[in-house]
Amino acid sequence: KVNPERAKQWAEEAVASGVIETEDQEIGFINSVTGGGNPLVEIWNSWSDTRLGAGYEQVLRAYNHPFLNMLFEKNTRIVNAKEPNNTLEAGTKVCGILAGAHVGQEQGSTSNPYNGFSQLNPKAMGSAPLYLMKLSEVCFLRAEGAVRGWNMGGTAKDFYEKGIREANVIDRTLQHRSLRQKYENAVDNYLTIESATPFTYVDPTGNDADRVSQITVGVKWNESDSKETKLEKIITQKYIAGFPNSLEAWVDLRRTGYPRLFNMLNMADGDGSLSDGAMVRRLPFPGSTDDATLKEINETGLKALGGPDKQGTRLWWDVNAPNF
């Protein structure tokens, strides 16, 4: 949006110079090579530090995506143990936490009702690589470029469908062939989905109101779709395939507005620059309590930022303009 011609030039130059086109070229920490396991499993499951987000759950349920039950476990502990009339027994369903929810400070399943929400499936994610750049991401980037009329070396449809086929996050070795086969067996039918399945999120704790999913686009590629609809399909599937790379997903969300996620809760907890329905556009500068750093922020940082040091200030590339 900032400079479409420059974006086109650089994207076409990148493709002409060579980009990731095979699984062997993917970049990341491959645990079957480096040894050890995926640290996210330790962080999620052992430390009880992280749980599935309702936004990701929403998108997976919209398409009955294989990842829902492949990558995540049903609530492994009781949810809302202190509320006998509103308790979700362990092993009932895959459930995520709404962004912005007040989850409490304790980590015990009795003291914190959110502790029992869905963890990672260690069988699928225990040896999953930590990808820095996946083949699927490159495919979706090229699909978007093709929709914009750039020379990406192929069609948007072909790149889009290949991105979905290459979305698997598990280890690519034969060690987990059965899990990989499970995903591959589901892809052909997945690519024919015409529209999203309606979904209403119900908070198992009862703390927050029900949320109706705003995702309506299907998976199937239709050449008759508008450019905007094609972009929404690409970014929505890219969001699924990119798990657990949340930073890349946040960039796309700010850049395009997709996928259509639930609004964040408790916006008043922010720095006053965010209204209901908005999202965090950036992280404020760190170290603002240090005199030297604060001086640097005031003299150069704010000038480069072009706005106040707030969560709602857009970065230079985050332009409030149509996608096309």
Language-model region placement:
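Extended ligand-binding clefts on enzyme/binding-domain cores
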Residues: 7-139, 146-264
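Long, compositionally biased
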Residues: 263-271
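Extended, compositionally biased alpha-helical segments that mediate assembly or anchoring
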Residues: 270-324
